């Protein structure tokens, strides 16, 4: 037995059984990994707020955000992380169905974000759901979710993916998310009186997808543009300023339904610089959304998708980056 194991054993032996310290505690509020092994759980410290399990895994009863141990929490706040999610076979999570969307987010990625910003059974809302990566991710970790999208084909693809994966199919709505969320009667009906713990969105990034393809994308789509829809309400068909204003409006509409200390998490990718235009879209989004009352920017995580195909952009004349990363911008509702 090494030194670490000895320290864990000593800490566990010195702690008292959880049920002795909290005989009337609502066990349903505990993480499943404690709840399912409650007879092994112990509490330590003067305040008896730290739960310790036989393997040394700990959970603090003051944690109002999620059901993670301290060690898991540390992993999830890493500011830069890389993944290589498969796009074939069982581990692709029905990518064969979801690939009708030009940029489907991996359900495993969305699940991991949801795990940090919610507790079990809390509500996740996605107003730009696409083919449902957020909803699939929520189902994978015992959360609830609701989604909206303009494109009925994408919504149907989500339902088919959920069926194939044998995951719960959550409520979905087809329509303009800004129009739907601006209608309090309709939004109250959609949410059914529930508070939102996490608004998790991957909006179309301005008119990026409406441009002709270059580089590696040509192999998949040809040179044609691949807009998400032809609708003028689609953020993906808007110019920069119109896009930023529409994105801000989409979040403002939902703010009063987000719980205090709830989070808004937004995926954004920069455009390539052009002349004197630096095109740091993530910075512009942070500034625009930080204008919303009671919503504060808390930081970002940078996701690098190592499965993205590389292409010699600019060769042999100048540097042009292969942008395999996206910014995950994190905001919190303070009041």
Question: Which positions does each model-derived feature cover?
Answer:
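Class I S-adenosyl-L-methionine-dependent methyltransferase catalytic core
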Residues: 1-335
């Amino acid at each position: 037995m090494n030194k670490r194991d000895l320290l864990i054993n000593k800490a566990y032996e010195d702690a008292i059984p959880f049920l002795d310290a909290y005989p009337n505690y609502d066990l349903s509020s505990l993480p499943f990994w404690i709840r399912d092994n409650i007879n092994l759980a112990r509490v330590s410290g003067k305040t008896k707020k730290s739960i310790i399990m036989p393997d040394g895994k700990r959970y603090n009863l003051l944690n109002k955000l999620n059901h993670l141990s301290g060690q898991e929490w540390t992993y999830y706040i890493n500011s830069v992380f890389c993944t290589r999610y498969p796009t074939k076979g069982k581990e692709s999570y029905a990518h064969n169905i979801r690939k009708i969307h030009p940029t489907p987010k991996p359900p495993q990625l969305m699940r991991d974000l949801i795990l940090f910003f919610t507790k079990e059974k809390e509500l996740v809302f996605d107003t730009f759901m696409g083919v449902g990566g957020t909803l699939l991710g929520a189902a994978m970790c015992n959360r609830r979710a609701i989604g909206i999208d303009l494109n009925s084909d994408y919504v149907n693809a989500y339902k088919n993916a959920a069926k194939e994966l044998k995951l719960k199919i959550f409520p979905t709505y087809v329509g303009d998310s800004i129009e739907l969320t601006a209608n309090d009667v309709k939004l109250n009906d959609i949410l059914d009186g529930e508070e939102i713990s996490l608004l998790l969105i991957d909006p179309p990034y301005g008119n990026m997808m409406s441009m002709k393809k270059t580089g590696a994308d040509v192999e998949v789509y040809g040179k044609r543009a691949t807009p998400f829809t032809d609708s003028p309400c689609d953020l993906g068909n808007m110019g920069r300023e119109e896009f930023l204003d529409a994105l801000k409006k989409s979040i403002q509409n939902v703010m009063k339904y987000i719980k205090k200390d709830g989070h808004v998490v937004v995926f954004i990718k920069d455009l390539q610089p052009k002349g004197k235009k630096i095109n740091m879209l993530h910075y512009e989004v942070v500034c625009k959304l930080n204008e919303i009352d009671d919503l504060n920017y808390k930081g970002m995580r940078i996701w690098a998708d190592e499965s993205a195909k590389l292409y010699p952009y600019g060769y042999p004349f100048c540097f042009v980056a292969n942008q395999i990363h996206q910014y995950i911008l994190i905001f919190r509702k303070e009041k």
